Amino acid sequence: MKFLVLLVALLLWPSSLPAYRRVTVTPDEEQNLNHYVQVLQNLILSVPTKEPGRQKKSKSPNNANFIGPRVSRVKELKYTHDVGPGDNDVLINPVSEETTTFPTRGFTLEIDKKKRTKSTAFWSIKPSNVSVVLHAKEPFIEKDEPEPEPEPEPEPEPVEHRTGAPTQVPSVTEPSQDVTSLSGSTDLGTATEEEDVPQLSGDNEMDYLESHDMYNEDVLKRIADINSQLHHVPLPESYKPEYRADIRASKEHLKRSLALAIAAEHKLEKMYKSQMLPQGRSSGGVYDIITVINMLYNSRYKLSEYLDIKYVPLEMRGKATVVVHTLKRILCVGHGEETHNLLKQLLNNNIRILHILDTHDKDDSS
């Protein structure tokens, strides 16, 4: 009941202030206001939400989820941070006497220990999808549907990423009331959105190596399949056992035929060399005489055919005629007279025999 009364008093307190006016507070008022804000935080967090999967009540801020340094609320501390509808942090945007701009992005932290300024604080408490905003005009509670956060853009300055662990706010020298950040822990039942983790360059190399290994394994598997198929191919006709004896016998016959052909060719070459005159040699040598005599002797049974013009080919008849006339001239020179005389003697002998026979017949008749 005390919390409810305190909440109503706190919600009605800023409505008495004029709209759009900067309120300056003293350090005591600031301390009291910080205390009220902390009580309001505890009250808001104790109210359970009705979303599915988030039925767990939040605990008191005095436990381990609300560990943080004790810092002053408005001590020369400026936070400018881009806040989405799902951030679970307490934003402190003090307004100093000078004109202060509120950029939408970036994170700056400035601490000035010497200068003290009067400022008006602005708080925004947004655990899960329930947002409580305290304005100078009128406080209200709005419930927004969770919207997907845009992907974080890379920034040159290092920024602490929010995780499930509670984050801490840097402290200022002068101790004051606690300023805690509402972290989205498991006790609060709020699910923190997963951050996009940039891919490292080594992941692409690992993917390439894995794909390369898979390609090599595929090639080796195909080679093994082809090898197994080759082993299962049926044997050709020449490798069947029933044909091996015939193939072996055919090979032996072929070897013998080749040997006989080589021997016959060698013999023919030798015979041709013995029957023909070697080119470029003179006819007066002993080698020529031996060659001619051997040739005529080996062909003595067919000399009548060889020397007959009608058996000689047309392109060789001129040479054959010259050879025959040469042989006739050689063989017939110096023997013509002897032959003529021999023939005369034979004729005379025949005439005498005839006369003797004729006289003998006459005597028998008388």
Curated annotation (Swiss-Prot):
Biased composition (Acidic residues): 144-157
Protein name: Sperm equatorial segment protein 1
Ranges of biased composition (kind: Polar residues): 165-189
Domain of life of the organism encoding this protein: Eukaryota
Lineage: Eukaryota, Metazoa, Chordata, Craniata, Vertebrata
PTM field: Glycosylated. In testis there are two predominant forms of 77- and 67-kDa and a form of 47-kDa, whereas in epididymal sperm from caput, corpus, and cauda there are two forms of 47- and 43-kDa. Testis forms contain complex carbohydrate residues. Epididymal sperm forms are N-glycosylated. Then undergoes significant glycosylation in the testis and that the majority of these glycoconjugates are removed by the time sperm reach the caput epididymis.
One GO term (biological process): sperm-egg recognition
Region (Disordered): 139-204
Signal peptide, first to last residue: 1-18
Gene Ontology CC, one term: acrosomal vesicle
